């Protein structure tokens, strides 16, 4: 197995979605700042994994049976809070962070950075190239898109919280993104890893998130 090839496959879904959203930005953000947030998002994956390990094994909380949804909700919350934390740390005081849509763009960059590490780990667990290609396509429309959408949702409410100068919207955004994360993973578990229903679910969510994105673009004109 070529680790370089499989690592490249792991990078592609995140880069593709990032390019898509960046092309939609009316006033493009500095590439160095986008790269910084993307890197921070990737780096925080290690922290999230540590917290999830603590909850799963240290507290005996496992994502099976009657506790499955609660487990997924806790794990999703950990990821969404950490992605927001690194994006906030990286850009909140930057002079380039000056438009409502910027909050969504930078959150998407953090989310896709997070997703790229997950994808590479998954690729390294596969030996056959044909299988890896099939899996990465599914992750492009599945887990990677999930991270983009959930992070965009946080970014939308982050922007609203800044516009309205109150924290309630940000809390709503983090809660909504965590719930989205949990519902997606729960659907996968319930459908026996069949991706049809989870992907349809994400497509429906995407319509609403893209509408939010257009709203913030309008506010940024």
Model-derived regions, located:
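Hydrophobic alpha-helical segments at protein termini of multi-pass membrane proteins
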Residues: 1-221
């Amino acid at each position: 197995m070529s680790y370089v090839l499989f690592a490249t496959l792991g990078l592609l879904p995140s880069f593709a979605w990032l390019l898509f959203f960046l092309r939609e930005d009316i006033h493009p953000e500095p590439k160095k700042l986008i790269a910084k947030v993307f890197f921070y998002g990737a780096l925080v994956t290690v922290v999230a994994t540590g917290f999830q390990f603590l909850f799963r094994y240290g507290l005996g909380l496992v994502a099976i049976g009657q506790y499955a949804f609660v487990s997924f909700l806790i794990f999703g919350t950990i990821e969404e809070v950490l992605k927001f934390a690194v994006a906030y740390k990286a850009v909140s005081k930057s002079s380039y962070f000056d438009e409502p849509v910027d909050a969504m763009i930078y959150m998407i960059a953090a989310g896709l950075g997070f997703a790229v590490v997950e994808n590479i780990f998954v690729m390294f667990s596969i030996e056959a190239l044909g299988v890896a290609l099939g899996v990465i396509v599914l992750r492009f429309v599945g887990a990677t898109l999930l991270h983009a959408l959930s992070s965009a949702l946080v970014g939308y409410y982050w922007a609203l919280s800044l516009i309205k100068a109150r924290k309630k919207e940000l809390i709503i955004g983090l809660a909504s993104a965590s719930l989205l994360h949990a519902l997606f993973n729960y659907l996968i578990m319930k459908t026996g890893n069949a991706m049809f229903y989870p992907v349809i679910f994400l497509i429906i969510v995407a319509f609403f998130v893209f509408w939010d994105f257009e709203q913030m673009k309008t506010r940024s004109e």
